[in-house]
């Protein structure tokens, strides 16, 4: 171990230690992935793992985890510590919650944390969050009118007590869900992940001859904070304003007002003027609002420094209490991603006025659309299966947007084979959508088309979580908007975009996903790239002539 005169770690040692802490979070994530039961975790990547110091501040997160999870988990741990002070934790304890106001903003996400001891001294905490395959109540949906309809709410409570299951808590959870085996399997996978994280941290401290993480966490978080401050200082001081509208629920369209104020090395995001909270599940609690505000700033201004607690210290996020971005309890919030995922677009709409070379156009992948199917499969087993699929990312300042990429979330689509293996559903089509990317000097990412047939003997329940039907992803600096989303049945009927319904045997659901917005004037696009797009089937000949003037 190498220290300088100030008792700081030298840069080489710090980089080695930082990389190893990230690898610990990655190994924890691999354990969760490999031992989970549900496809939502092992196929769609809807989970995250975080290593935190003894104060509950984040040190490292798994590569490719859900961005909001790593941003929120330290906040949730501090709520755990408020109920269970540090001196009361014992080796093997595991505290759990899914309270939206304390954790990730909706009930399906379950947060767990365990203490890490070395030589009887508390040196840190491991944490994991995973989207449960079921949490009771309604299906994952947007049409509930208050939190109590949306499922089981678990207050902070010990799931394990000194390594032993708290059977009463386990029984309470499993007695309120449709898929108890899968739910318990995923909960145990989270416990396994947390234990792996703890073991590997102790090994790291032994190998590094460190008594604890105190100096290292101070140094790592300080470096991350300074990197973010340096990046913010490159943005001209000023207040930058943008708005964004979304479909909302029925007549309650969502309007987001955003002012990004930069002063020196500090950045403030203020959502004053945003729509009030509604009695449908689109409300986004402040934890989630903060996470999906800070993350796009990090992506734009300081994308390469690994994230930890220090990355967020220069960023302040405020939203009016009672707004859709800071609702009062017990507002419904089950589909909060349909609002929270939009924040990157409006933040970039503000920052493009100051640093156009650092931001992307609005993304059709935000918000991510979901279709939730539930019923009984031919073997007589209850199932709930979620189709994860994405629209296109917004175009970049010097690059086309990525097709069908889940920005700002990292949830994956998963394989069709896995999707079909647990439910009486057949996917007949899953392909890129021609002409869906917004035209520009750099084209928006393509959306996709999916067609799914019900092969059960009985009706299934379907919950749709979608947006961008009326408000497509916007282009910037002369770029055109991407194509909007659309959902319909094979008989031509159009379902409610955010509600539950029954779907009959033999019915086919056709889902069309939005494209990303374009960046820059389409007439500035290299004609050779337009012709390549036509050749590859991304852009039709008619659109090439209409939007780009290329034939």
Model-based region annotation:
Residues 94:
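Glycine-rich phosphate-binding loop of nucleotide-binding enzymes
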């Amino acid at each position: 171990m190498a220290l300088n005169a100030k008792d700081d770690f030298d840069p080489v040692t710090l980089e080695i230690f930082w990389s190893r802490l990230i690898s610990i979070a990655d190994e924890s994530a691999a354990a969760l992935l490999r031992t989970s039961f549900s496809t939502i975790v092992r196929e769609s990547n809807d989970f995250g793992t975080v290593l935190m110091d003894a104060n509950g501040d984040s040190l490292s997160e798994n590569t490719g985890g859900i961005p909001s999870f790593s941003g929120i988990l330290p906040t949730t741990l501090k709520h755990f510590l408020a109920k269970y002070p540090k001196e009361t934790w014992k080796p093997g304890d595991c505290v759990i919650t899914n309270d939206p106001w304390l954790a990730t903003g909706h009930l399906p996400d379950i947060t767990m944390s365990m203490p890490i001891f070395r030589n009887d001294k508390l040196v840190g905490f491991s944490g994991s969050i995973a989207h449960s395959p079921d949490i009771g109540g309604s299906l994952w949906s947007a049409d509930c009118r208050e939190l109590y309809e949306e499922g089981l709410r678990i207050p902070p409570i010990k799931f394990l007590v000194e390594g032993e299951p708290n059977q009463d808590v386990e029984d309470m959870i499993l007695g309120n869900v449709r898929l108890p085996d899968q739910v318990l399997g995923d909960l145990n996978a989270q416990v396994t992940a947390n234990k792996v994280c703890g073991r590997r941290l102790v090994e790291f401290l032994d190998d590094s001859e460190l008594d604890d993480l105190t100096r290292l966490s101070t140094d790592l978080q300080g470096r991350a904070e300074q990197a973010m401050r340096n990046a913010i200082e490159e943005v001209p001081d000023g207040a930058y304003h943008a708005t964004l509208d979304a479909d909302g629920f029925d007549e309650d369209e969502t309007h987001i007002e955003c002012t990004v104020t930069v002063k020196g090395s500090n950045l403030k995001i203020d959502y004053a003027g945003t729509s009030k909270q509604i009695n449908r599940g689109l409300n986004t609690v402040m934890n989630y609002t903060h996470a999906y505000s800070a993350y796009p700033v990090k992506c734009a201004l300081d994308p390469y420094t690994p994230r930890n607690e220090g990355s967020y210290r220069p960023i302040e996020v405020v939203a009016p209490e009672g707004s859709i971005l800071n609702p009062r309890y017990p507002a419904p919030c089950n589909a909060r991603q349909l609002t929270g995922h939009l924040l990157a677009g409006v933040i970039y709409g503000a920052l493009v006025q100051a640093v156009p070379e650092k931001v992307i156009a609005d993304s059709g992948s935000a918000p991510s659309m979901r279709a939730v199917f539930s019923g009984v499969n031919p073997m007589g087993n209850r199932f709930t299966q979620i189709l994860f699929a994405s629209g296109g990312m917004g175009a970049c300042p010097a690059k086309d947007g990525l097709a069908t990429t889940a920005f700002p979330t990292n949830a994956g689509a998963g394989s069709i084979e896995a999707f079909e293996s647990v439910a009486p559903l057949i996917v007949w089509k899953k392909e890129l959508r021609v002409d869906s990317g917004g035209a520009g000097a750099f084209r928006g990412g393509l959306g996709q088309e999916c067609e799914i047939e019900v092969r059960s003997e009985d009706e299934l329940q379907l919950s749709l979580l979608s947006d961008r039907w009326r408000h497509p992803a916007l282009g910037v600096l002369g770029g055109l908007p991407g194509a909007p989303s659309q959902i319909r049945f094979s008989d031509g009927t159009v379902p409610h975009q955010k509600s539950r319904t029954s779907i009959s045997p033999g019915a086919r659901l056709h889902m069309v996903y939005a494209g990303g917005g374009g960046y820059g004037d389409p007439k500035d696009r290299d004609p050779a790239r337009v012709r390549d797009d036509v050749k590859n089937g991304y852009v039709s000949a008619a659109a090439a002539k209409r939007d780009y003037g290329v034939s």
